[in-house]
């Protein structure tokens, strides 16, 4: 057996579980923690780094720049948020962008993928108390205001 995390080895040998059923829930917990810490750093106007994700707050402009693997994926200010794909339309990039949208945009706004293409879901208003959204092609530099 190859080297694996002790808990996974235990579950394979004792309980018969396979690593593939365990890795995704564990990964999603880690991702949510990183994204929560990322959002907290932006709220507190602080520099922060964990793993492949970093936040740098520029006090002069009042903008927090979020990077994934060193590539800029977002600029967050008090008034708006600009998103980028950083050159990689990956699951992780999309996850980070959606965590930012969940925190700093209107509920329901975000980035999604359909047939290998990225799209942005943008709030445009409310009709009879119901939120209305439009879907637009994703472009690096898209601004949520």
Which sequence ranges carry the predicted segments?
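Short, positively charged low-complexity motifs
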Residues: 1-4, 10-22
């Amino acid at each position: 057996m190859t080297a694996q995390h002790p808990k996974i080895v235990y579950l394979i040998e004792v309980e018969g579980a396979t690593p593939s059923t365990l890795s995704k829930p564990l990964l999603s917990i880690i991702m949510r923690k990183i994204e929560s810490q990322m959002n907290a750093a932006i709220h507190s106007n602080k520099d922060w780094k964990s793993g492949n994700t970093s936040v740098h707050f520029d006090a002069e402009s009042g903008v927090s720049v979020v990077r994934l693997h060193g590539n800029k994926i977002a600029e967050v200010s008090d008034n708006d948020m600009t998103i980028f794909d950083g050159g990689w339309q990956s699951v992780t990039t999309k996850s980070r962008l959606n965590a930012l949208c969940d925190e700093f945009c209107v509920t329901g706004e975000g980035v999604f993928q359909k047939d290998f293409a990225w799209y942005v879901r943008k709030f445009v208003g409310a009709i009879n108390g119901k939120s209305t959204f439009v879907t637009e092609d994703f472009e690096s530099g898209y601004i949520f205001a």
